[in-house]
């Protein structure tokens, strides 16, 4: 028995050794540059998802959504009710939204929402104001989380944010109502000889949810963050999020159907935890899509170029102070994201380290809205002081002559330093190591005194 166990353990050890050797051989194989780039992008994306705590943010958004969904739908359907053309559309719109967004327990959720909205319609002006504040709280939380993903230090001004929120609360329901009304109308129109084949119609209808989701997610990623997001990046992120959302809907519905744990434990209240879990999954998918959108640009900035090297720390510091100096003359500050856009060759880590070093030495500081400002009088702050606080070697003058005006002036000073350095260090090692006549005489005198 013991022999068999030892033999089995030996075989497992051999198997692990072979697997480890096979993995080493695979890693040693030359890979296509695209494969390595894709792997690096995936690692960067996972790192950002962990750093931004997307799972935690999704949980927070799920709870806020649970509180705000009734106020949002109440305000939205109140807007639709103000237009006679949408009469009779609100019920179909609510049912369609619940069926579309909640893959399980949709009937129970729809019943609860209808009851809650009916009661909300009977509230006084104070109650309606409270519902509006709750809805605005959700929109503000969404904007804050997305701004954190894009490293936005300075949010929109209060008035501008209120206008954006109010536009979403009023125009969003109108667009949804127009969509549902148009779909219902097109379903009753006889297209005659131009009617496409039924198979094609079925395929288009099956594809419609994916396309609509991708458009909505793309608009969220491009409009909500207080940052300039390339349209192509937002579209790619929207498509990824839409695909993940469809997979999540199918998987969640299958899980609830085959493992009715919530119904067994909670009974009639099972719809609430099911809905809460689904809200969490939905927000996690949305945040992952946002991370993909951000990573399409951020991955290029992750390491930077020459300015990310310690040898060029002085040049990077001068660039940072130059941008802050120009902004100060306009009476403004510069955010981290704006600096990164102006100095993409620096990369996020090196730029963050340089800013922290300058802040630690009280050369710069951050304002209440997150912008960086100069904290020292530039007329009394010398280049020598800046170099001493960086604790890195001087960069070469070559390569700076064609840069910004401050680069050319810095290159001139560096050339003078290099010339004097050459003169000071124009000494052979023999001359350096050989004692001088004075040192030799002092040594003989010391030996004579000892004797």
UniProtKB/Swiss-Prot annotation:
Main location group: membrane
Membrane-spanning residues: 66-86, 122-142, 162-182, 204-224, 228-248, 268-288
Membrane topology: Multi-pass membrane protein
Localization per Swiss-Prot or TrEMBL: Cell inner membrane
Sorted UniProt keywords: Cell inner membrane, Cell membrane, Membrane, Transmembrane, Transmembrane helix
InterPro entries per UniProt: UPF0761_bac (IPR023679), Virul_fac_BrkB (IPR017039), WH-like_DNA-bd_sf (IPR036388)
Classification via Pfam families: Virul_fac_BrkB
Coiled coil: none
GO CC term, one of those recorded: plasma membrane
PANTHER family assigned: INNER MEMBRANE PROTEIN YHJD (PTHR30213), UPF0761 MEMBRANE PROTEIN YIHY (PTHR30213:SF0)
Protein family (similarity comment): Belongs to the UPF0761 family.
HAMAP family given in the database record: UPF0761 (MF_00672)
NCBIfam families (alphabetical): PRK01637.1, yihY_not_rbn
Protein name: UPF0761 membrane protein Hhal_0704
């Amino acid at each position: 028995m013991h022999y068999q166990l030892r033999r089995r353990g030996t075989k497992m050890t051999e198997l692990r050794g072979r697997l480890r050797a096979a993995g080493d051989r695979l890693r040693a194989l030359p890979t296509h540059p695209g494969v390595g780039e894709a792997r690096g992008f995936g690692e960067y994306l996972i790192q950002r998802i962990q750093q931004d705590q997307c799972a935690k943010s999704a949980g927070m958004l799920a709870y806020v959504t649970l509180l705000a969904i009734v106020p949002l739908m109440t305000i939205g359907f109140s807007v639709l009710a103000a237009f006679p053309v949408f009469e009779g559309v609100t019920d179909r719109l609510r049912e369609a939204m619940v069926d579309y967004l909640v893959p399980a327990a949709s009937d129970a959720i729809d019943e609860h929402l209808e009851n809650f909205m009916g009661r909300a319609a009977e509230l006084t002006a104070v109650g309606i104001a409270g519902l509006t504040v709750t809805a605005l709280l959700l929109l503000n939380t969404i904007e804050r989380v997305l701004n954190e993903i894009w490293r936005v230090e300075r949010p929109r001004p209060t008035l501008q944010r209120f206008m954006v929120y109010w536009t979403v609360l009023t125009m969003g329901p109108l667009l949804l109502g127009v969509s549902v009304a148009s779909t219902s109308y097109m379903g009753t129109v006889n297209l005659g000889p131009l009617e496409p084949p039924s198979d094609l119609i079925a395929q288009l209808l099956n594809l419609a949810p994916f396309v609509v989701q991708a458009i909505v997610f793309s608009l969220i990623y491009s409009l909500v963050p207080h940052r300039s997001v390339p349209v192509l990046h937002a579209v790619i992120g929207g498509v990824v999020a839409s695909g993940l959302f469809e997979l999540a809907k199918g998987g969640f519905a299958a899980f609830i159907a085959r493992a009715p744990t919530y119904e067994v434990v909670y009974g009639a209240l099972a719809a609430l935890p099911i809905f809460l879990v689904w809200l969490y999954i939905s927000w996690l998918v949305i945040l992952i899509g946002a991370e993909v959108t951000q990573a399409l640009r951020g991955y290029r900035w992750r390491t930077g170029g020459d300015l990310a090297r310690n040898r060029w720390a002085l040049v990077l510091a001068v660039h940072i102070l130059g941008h802050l100096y120009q902004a100060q003359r306009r009476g403004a500050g510069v955010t981290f994201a704006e600096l990164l856009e102006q100095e993409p060759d620096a990369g996020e880590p090196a730029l963050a380290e340089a800013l922290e070093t300058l802040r630690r030495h009280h050369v710069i500081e951050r304002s209440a809205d997150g912008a960086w400002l100069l904290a020292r009088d530039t007329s009394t702050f010398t280049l020598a002081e800046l170099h001493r606080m960086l604790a890195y070697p001087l960069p070469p003058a070559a390569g700076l002559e064609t840069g910004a005006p401050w680069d050319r002036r810095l290159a001139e000073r560096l050339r003078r330093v290099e010339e004097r350095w050459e003169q000071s260090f124009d000494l052979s090692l023999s001359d350096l190591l050989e004692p001088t006549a004075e040192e030799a005489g002092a040594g003989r005198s010391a030996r004579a005194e000892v004797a």
